[in-house]
């Protein structure tokens, strides 16, 4: 929408491009130059494609900016130049890829002395990478012509951006054949051997790290590519070279040459770990196993790698005993002399990866060196090193779960066997795993009993003990583990059995308790809610005596409030019953029950609307809501429920509008109206039948009484006692007690009325009094309007009503009802009608 209607401000670049002397820097100073370039601004692209402009853009990237410039704007133009050249504009990519002079100028950045400017190196790498991805053939051909390209890459491998460029060269070329050509070219240039030579104690730490990361990424990318391309005829030459035994031996000889350099050792171990992992691990500490029966080279470890590592297991074991020297480390727990160090931690990771391969020869060498015993000693010595504890736990779990491998034919025996699993026997007999677990557990309990802190390895120790118990019950070595436990001394075996039953069982029970509510599942929430509903605070959480409650108890909840229903609610129910037929009525299946009925207005109702406006008619919706809320909570008899009975047998033949508030007032003088509206009265019993009997005709209040407010009559009977202190109570007390039914008083005029209107008066029980209404009938429209005889207008008001008839206002709060043909003939009498009386808002 913003761009469609051209609401954005016009760019200043078009104005600048119209000038003949505009310079590149002036355009680069504009804030929206990048947006215009990516939006394919034709004039801007044509300007940038000029030879001098492209040369300037490349120069900004490869040349060091002046030192005396402000640091805030020093790299402004190099950054914008890089973004313009990498905006992926096809014309610009074509010009750069085809112009060898520009490529040579860009390539000259590698000719600078090391170390390179890291920021400019990132700009250079980004531009060359997008050219490799968009113009692979031209760029690769150009780089192949440069004999020193690989040498320069190795020279600047300490710069991270150059390492990224090497990896982009391996990944950005998508066509299979060009990619294979690049791999063969790099393999011929001995890129693997050169990277391995960098992992040497004599080299810098940055070069160690970047060279190691490059080799690791080459291994991962090659294996992923092999998995994706199953029908590849040619193996990955770089991966095959790196997996050669002589290459691994060269790598290990570099790190163990003379002095021990931690950076070189850690970098070399990272390469070995990558070669030993068949696929990328899903999470730290977990090595994904190749699916059974899958012999793909990407899912197996090369035997040459294992043989090369096996020859150096003694050197790795010496690193566990004598790591590179590290200074004493002060921690919040205490002094570490020496600390574990990154070297020993990575050696233990290497041992866990070797155990994952389950090679019998390597397992035998580890047993002879007692490497498992050494790492177990470190487990209990360094109490708070959770990285170490995790790796030791993995090693023990692998030994317990690894099936026995036959050394003669290399087959793996899956069934339970007490065969010569020497490493497992070594773990229980020589390393005394059971005894050390029991000793560490007792030491921790004594320390905690004295008020000391719990040892940091207790969680891992619990998991190791559970792993032993699990291996005893099931697993490939269950029979051997059971035999090894039986061979323990009687005292140790009894202590172990007691430990598993008591201490370990209690710990597992405590650890399995959920931190959240125990019955947090949805199917349990309903029953608990029913049982605990209404409990006191001190008893709310007590669930000991709560049994399983069936779901059927939901129906026992009673949400009914024993409060008095206001007149508005009863009136609404009466309206619904009259306007909506029952849904089981077969005769109304085809009738839309929500269809609006036609509402006819008589001149009497219009005259009333224009002349009888009162405060009650002008009340707001908020006042109605407040009144409804107040009525809802009024006290009343719990056994009496007053509702208007409506005959539902006859179809509705009249419609009504109940949009106006139905306030109630008694037939009291005007000065008492409003003060007795909310008074509480004693309810009177009402008859269930005969509510529309017109045989009882009684005189209503005197027509000479003063005019009362034009408020609707309460449409339900109330027989509550009248408060003698409320105004108007005396007037109510003087009236005779009326029966519990309503009597309609009908009157009809003769031929004198030009409108041929009929009037019927009705006596309504309003609390403890009677109130008479007038029913005006229009013969033309057959509509009836109820009016109160109290609402008399003077002669001057009659004149005002006639004026209002000429300009009627929108009719509000009218209720008209067409007479049904089956109306009783007793409804018409000889009493003359009073056309000037305002009608009452609301039906009976």
Curated annotation (Swiss-Prot):
Q: Which residues carry this modification: Phosphothreonine?
A: 602, 820
Identify the tissues in which this protein is expressed.
Strongest expression observed in lung, spleen, bladder and liver and weaker levels present in brain, heart, kidney, skeletal muscle and pancreas.
Q: Which GO terms describe its molecular function?
A: protein phosphatase binding; protein phosphatase regulator activity
Superkingdom: Eukaryota
Q: Can you tell me which family this protein belongs to? A: Belongs to the SAPS family.
Annotated function: Regulatory subunit of protein phosphatase 6 (PP6). May function as a scaffolding PP6 subunit. May have an important role in maintaining immune self-tolerance.
> Protein name, please?
Serine/threonine-protein phosphatase 6 regulatory subunit 3
- Originating species: Mus musculus
């Amino acid at each position: 929408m913003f761009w469609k209607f051209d609401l954005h401000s016009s760019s200043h670049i078009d104005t600048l491009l119209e000038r003949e002397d505009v310079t590149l820097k002036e355009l680069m100073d504009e804030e929206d130059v990048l947006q215009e370039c990516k939006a394919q601004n034709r004039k801007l692209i044509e300007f940038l494609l000029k030879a001098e402009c492209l040369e300037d853009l490349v120069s900004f990237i490869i040349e060091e900016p002046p030192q005396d410039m402000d640091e805030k704007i020093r790299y402004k133009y190099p950054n914008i130049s890089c973004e313009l050249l990498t905006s992926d504009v096809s014309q610009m990519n074509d010009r750069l890829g085809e112009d060898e002079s520009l490529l040579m100028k860009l390539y000259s950045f590698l000719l600078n002395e090391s170390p390179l400017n890291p920021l400019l190196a990132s700009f250079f790498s980004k531009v060359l990478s997008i050219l490799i991805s968009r113009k692979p053939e031209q760029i690769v051909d150009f780089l192949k012509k440069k004999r020193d390209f690989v040498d320069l890459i190795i020279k600047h491998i300490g710069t991270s951006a150059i390492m990224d460029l090497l990896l982009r060269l391996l990944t950005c070329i998508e066509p299979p054949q060009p990619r294979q050509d690049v791999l063969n070219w790099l393999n011929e240039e001995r890129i693997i051997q050169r990277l391995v030579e960098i992992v040497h104690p004599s080299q810098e730490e940055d070069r160690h790290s970047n060279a190691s990361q490059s080799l690791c990424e080459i291994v991962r990318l090659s294996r992923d590519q092999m998995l994706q391309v199953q029908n590849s005829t040619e193996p990955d030459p770089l991966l095959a070279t790196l997996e050669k035994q002589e290459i691994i031996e060269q790598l290990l000889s570099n790190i163990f040459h003379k002095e021990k350099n931690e950076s070189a050792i850690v970098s070399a171990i990272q390469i070995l770990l990558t070669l030993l992992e068949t696929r990328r691990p899903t999470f730290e500490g977990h090595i994904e196993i190749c699916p059974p029966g899958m012999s793909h080279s990407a899912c197996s470890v090369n035997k040459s790698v294992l043989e090369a590592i096996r020859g150096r297991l003694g050197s790795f074991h010496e690193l566990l005993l004598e790591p590179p020297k590290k200074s004493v480390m002060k921690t919040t727990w205490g002094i570490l002399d020496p600390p574990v160090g990154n070297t020993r931690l990575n050696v233990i990771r290497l041992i866990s990866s070797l155990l994952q391969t389950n090679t019998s020869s390597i397992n035998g060498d580890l047993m002879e060196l007692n490497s498992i015993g050494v790492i177990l000693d470190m487990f209990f010595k360094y109490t708070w090193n959770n990285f170490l504890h995790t790796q030791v736990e993995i090693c023990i779990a692998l030994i317990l779960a690894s099936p026995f491998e036959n050394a003669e034919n290399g087959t793996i025996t899956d069934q339970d066997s007490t065969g010569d699993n020497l490493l497992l026997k070594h773990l229980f007999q020589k390393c005394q795993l059971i005894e050390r677990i029991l000793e560490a557990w007792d030491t921790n309990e004594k320390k905690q009993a004295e008020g000391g802190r719990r040892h940091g390895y207790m969680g891992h120790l619990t998991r190791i003990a559970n792993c032993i118990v699990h291996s005893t019950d099931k697993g490939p070595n269950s029979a051997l583990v059971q035999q090894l436990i039986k061979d323990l001394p009687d005292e140790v075996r009894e202590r172990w059995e007691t430990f598993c039953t008591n201490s370990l069982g209690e710990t597992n029970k405590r650890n399995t308790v959920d931190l959240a509510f125990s019955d947090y599942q949805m199917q349990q929430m309903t029953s608990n809610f029913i049982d605990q509903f209404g409990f006191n605070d001190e008893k709310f959480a007590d669930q000991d005596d709560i049994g399983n409650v069936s779901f059927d108890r939901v129906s026992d909840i009673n949400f009914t409030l024993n409060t008095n229903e206001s007149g508005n609610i009863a009136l609404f129910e009466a309206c619904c019953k009259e306007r909506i037929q029952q849904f089981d009525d077969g005769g109304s299946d085809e009738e839309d029950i929500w269809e609006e009925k036609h509402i006819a207005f008589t001149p009497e109702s219009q005259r009333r609307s224009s002349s009888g406006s009162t405060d009650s008619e002008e009340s707001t919706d908020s006042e109605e809501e407040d009144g409804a809320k107040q009525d809802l909570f009024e006290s009343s008899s719990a056994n009496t429920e007053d509702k208007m009975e409506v005959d539902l047998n006859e179809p509705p033949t009249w419609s009504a509008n109940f949009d106006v508030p139905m306030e109630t007032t008694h037939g009291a003088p005007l000065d008492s109206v409003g003060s007795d509206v909310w008074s509480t009265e004693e309810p009177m019993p009402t008859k269930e039948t005969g509510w529309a009997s017109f045989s009882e005709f009684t005189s209503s209040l005197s027509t000479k009484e003063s005019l009362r407010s034009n408020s609707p009559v309460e449409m339900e009977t109330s027989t509550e006692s009248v408060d003698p202190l409320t105004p108007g109570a005396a007037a109510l007390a003087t009236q005779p007690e009326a029966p519990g039914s309503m009597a309609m008083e009908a009157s009809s005029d003769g031929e004198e009325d030009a409108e041929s209107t009929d009037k019927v008066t009705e006596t309504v029980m309003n609390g403890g009094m009677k109130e008479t209404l007038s029913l005006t009938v229009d013969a033309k429209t057959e509509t009836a309007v109820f009016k109160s005889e109290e609402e008399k207008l003077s002669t001057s008001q009659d004149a005002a009503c006639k004026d209002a008839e000429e300009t009627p206002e929108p009719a509000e709060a009218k209720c008209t009802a067409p007479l049904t043909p089956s109306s009783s003939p007793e409804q018409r009498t000889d009493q003359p009608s009073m056309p000037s009386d305002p009608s009452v808002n609301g039906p009976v």
